[in-house]
Structures are given as C-alpha cells and as structure tokens.
Amino acid sequence: MDKNGPIGIIDSGVGGITVLKRLLEILPEEDYIYFGDTLRVPYGNRPKEEIEKFTREIVNYLKKQKVKAVVIACNTICSSINKNDYEILMFGILEAGIKSAVEATSNGRIGVIATKRTVESEAYLKGIKRLNRNAMVFQKACPELVLIVENGFYEASSIYSAVKKCTEEFLEKDIDTLVLGCTHFPILLPFIERVVDNKVTVVDPAIKLAHEVKKYLVENNLVKDKKGGQIRFLVTGEKENFIKVAGTFLNDKHIDVLRIAIEELK
C-alpha cells in the first residue's frame, strides 16, 4: 500500500462533506477523493441489494484511482454492506456513531435520527445495545432533512420547522444524547441544537471517525510524507447544488467538481 495514495470518501450525495471537513482538521496534508453519488441520491429508501451494488461500483472505481483507504461517510451504506467483503482498508461512520453515543450518554437514553434504511436495519439499536445492554434507543427516519441539504437549503424558518418536527418528540423520551445518524445532518447542526437546547448532547460521529482514521494511519506508518494536500470532488449528478452546499460548509467558494458518468462505474 502506497502511504502517499489518496483517501477515498464515499457518500450518496453531499452529506459526507461533514466527514471530509473533520478529516481535514486533523489530517490536512493528506490527499482525498470525495465521491458523491448525487445522481442516485437518496440511498435511504433503496433496497439493501441495490445499495450494495452501487457501493461495489464506487469502491472499484476508487481502487483504480489507487486510494490507500476508503471512508464510508454514509450511515445507510454502512448499514447495508459488510466491510469485510471489500479487499481494501475501510472505515465506517456508523461504527463511530455507535461508540460515540455510548461514550456520551449518562442516563442511557439515546435518540437516533437517520434515513429509513438505517433505521430499519436497526444497526444503531443493535450496536448500542451490544456495548450497553441497558441502553434505551429511540430512532426516527428523517428523509426530508436529507432532501433539504441535497437541494441546497430553503429559508431558515422552513429548515427549523422540519428539524423541529423530526426531533422534538425525542425530548419527551428524556434522552440525554442525540446521534446524527446521517452525515447530511451536521450541516443542519445550528437548527438541531436550537430545538434540543442544552438538554441534550448532540453527537456528530464524524469527529470520532476522523480520529480513528488518523490513529490507524499513524500506528501503521501510512501517514502521507509529502506536503500539500489536494482534494478531488467527483459526482454522478449535476454539480451546481453540490458546489453550493459543499463550498458553503467548507468555506471554499471555488471548489472544482468533476462529473462522472454512471457508465464509467460499470
């Protein structure tokens, strides 16, 4: 494995930018290839078999780009595949979210907002219970929040109303921890924190995931030894909304995005 190879980041759309941002904070000299499957987003309502197929196509494409590792920045993908089936070093956001939730909670009452597919898989429920069998896990699918992010936002009042509708019922459950079980959701963090106020710890799994990636690279002498990190953005759909959302979140209005035809993944 070439330590100077790029790190691949996969998401169904623009949400994985939240993971890229955390990685850039602690591994700024690494090269990254971000792949957003924006033509086929959202994944959350698709069957497991279809998600597996799409993921295999993207991973194989990234292998051809000589990536040294793949970061799955999509909880829906993580809940649909077995990472051991892929012959490449792979890190997953969902596992980081499970660990973060268990570490954050004091009363063992944890809320999870995610996509329909992630909720139905019960991956968070089972994972949290595996680490804390006494935990109470309350889940809710919030596909409308994914669409808000992918479409490049609406007016603030509309976003707040959608976030409130999705999250306020958790407060009645006396949760002390809320997991953002979809990488799109940290983009809406100011609105989420406004709804839950100071009563709940909001967990962004990308923080732990980024530290796990760095820890592995350091311990296995895989940290890039050349200076000056570069980022390549690849999408399968239209570029405009991706550039708008990603550019805003990364504070970079001039990101270059290349569109990849689905046929190139076959």
Swiss-Prot record:
Q: Which NCBIfam families match?
A: glut_race
Q: Known PANTHER family for this protein?
A: GLUTAMATE RACEMASE (PTHR21198:SF2)
Keyword Isomerase appears in the UniProt entry: yes
Question: Gene3D superfamilies, per this entry?
Answer: 3.40.50.1860
UniProt keywords, alphabetically: Cell shape, Cell wall biogenesis/degradation, Isomerase, Peptidoglycan synthesis
Keyword Transmembrane helix annotated: no
What the protein does comes down to: Provides the (R)-glutamate required for cell wall biosynthesis.
PROSITE patterns assigned to the protein according to its UniProt record, in alphabetical order:
ASP_GLU_RACEMASE_2
Q: Where does substrate bind?
A: 11-12, 43-44, 75-76, 183-184
InterPro entries named among the record's database cross-references? Asp/Glu/hydantoin_racemase, Asp/Glu_race, Asp/Glu_racemase_AS_2, Glu_race
- How would you classify this enzyme at the top EC level? isomerase
User: What protein does this entry describe?
Assistant: Glutamate racemase 1
| Any GO BP annotation | cell wall organization
Organism lineage reads as: Bacteria, Bacillati, Bacillota, Clostridia, Thermoanaerobacterales
- Reaction catalysis annotation: L-glutamate = D-glutamate
What is the species listed in this Swiss-Prot or TrEMBL entry?
Answer: Caldanaerobacter subterraneus subsp. tengcongensis (strain DSM 15242 / JCM 11007 / NBRC 100824 / MB4)
Supply the EC number(s).
Answer: 5.1.1.3
Molecular functions per Gene Ontology: glutamate racemase activity
